[in-house]
Amino acid sequence: MKEIEDITDIKLFVNEFYEKVKNDILIGPVFLEKIPGDWQPHLDKMHAFWNAALFGVPGFKGNPFAKHAPLKINAEHFDRWLELFDETIDNHFEGYMAEDTKNRAKLMAGMFLSRLQKMNGEHNKVVF
């Protein structure tokens, strides 16, 4: 196993992760409804997002929360997303950057869930 070092590593974990997502019984249908056809534009955007988040490389443009706000997702969906994400990272990588990547994903998921719950008038029920 190795550290996450560059865009090649990012592409590996992003592509494998979203294959798992598409085939997952809980979160797969949510993603497949939103992205019914060609996934490459989404994958390219996620490559750029993680490259910016982890290595400060410019190139990501977008508002990730705005894309998730209209979806019917809850804590169970976020927990499953994180489970698949962590599993993917752990299958290929170790070290500081692997842990940092998982921590960033967890922070982002928690923020998204909290904002969605506030939008829906729910109390904060973060489960992670």
Say what each PLM segment does.
Residues M1-F128:
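Core of compact, soluble alpha-helical bundle domains
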